[in-house]
């Protein structure tokens, strides 16, 4: 007689949640709770806003991911050390819990939650693309990785012609250098030169104040109104900017609402869960956290979320076999490692504090495909949501 499989409950079906579910599916009774009906490959969103047909490939159905486990599509409103409560009243218990709630940023760089049908989703990206096409001047608020990748996609789609700018693009960034202050000088110089080559005006150490309606969009992960409207903006330091279109790439927020009540003693000031190197939430043997909602001092990337998932999956498997905590797999926290696409043919990848890979290597690693086919394969090649 075989023993009943242990129950693993995973809250969140993003990069980390999908990976840990897939790895544990054959050995455990796996349940994934996710508020979206499909996986959103956010890495590809920067290209989908200028090539909206790509939406058909970055919204990936979950139906082929698990052979044994199941998905529950709903919103978790409360997570405790013993159960998870859903908005519809369901209560789910577990033997092992994986919190993979991720983070919010503004659509279209995270899925706009109010766009539920395939036609709504496609129309949203088509409209976004049309507004970019029509705009003569674009203001990008924020100068992180998403902003630099987005600008590069726009310029690739609408390049300089006859020595005249098709579009004037301005980046306003609160930091002292683009992408992230932890990047080495070579990386930063390549990005700065790439923006200059693309005739992008970069304003550093300054801000555009975020309006209340944009803050509400961020809180609810809904889409800001994207519409051509010639406006005059002023930075906090008084720099005037005229733009037909404003795109916000700032405001990443940890999705902590569901767990903050019961885990308040192990949450940092950013709402992230404090974890050990086996991805266990501090003080809890059977509760794990992975991805953006962890307090690991490293970049919050799809790659790192997947790496955390592998660590957590190995740890859960080991615990189920009676192994002690000191025998569990351990995460090696990475330094500032990042692959940045600068359009389909260009980019730079920092692989250590002192070393970078150049344009050709980055093109092959990321820029050419933005990992789109990789994640379709990762979810076991389901039939596209949007035909």
UniProtKB/Swiss-Prot annotation:
Keyword Oxidoreductase attributed: yes
Entries under Gene3D superfamilies matching the protein: 3.50.50.100
GO molecular-function terms, A-Z: electron-transferring-flavoprotein dehydrogenase activity; flavin adenine dinucleotide binding
GO cellular component labels: cytoplasm
One family name in Pfam for this protein: Pyr_redox_2
PANTHER family: APOPTOSIS-INDUCING FACTOR 1, FERROPTOSIS SUPPRESSOR PROTEIN 1
Cofactor(s) this protein requires: FAD
Source organism of this protein record: Dictyostelium discoideum (Social amoeba)
UniProt keywords, alphabetically: FAD, Flavoprotein, Oxidoreductase
Binding positions (FAD): 12-16, 47, 292
Keyword match Plastid: no
Function: Putative FAD-dependent oxidoreductase.
Family per similarity comment: Belongs to the FAD-dependent oxidoreductase family.
Source superkingdom: Eukaryota
Name the UniProt record assigns to this protein: Apoptosis-inducing factor homolog B
Top EC group: oxidoreductase
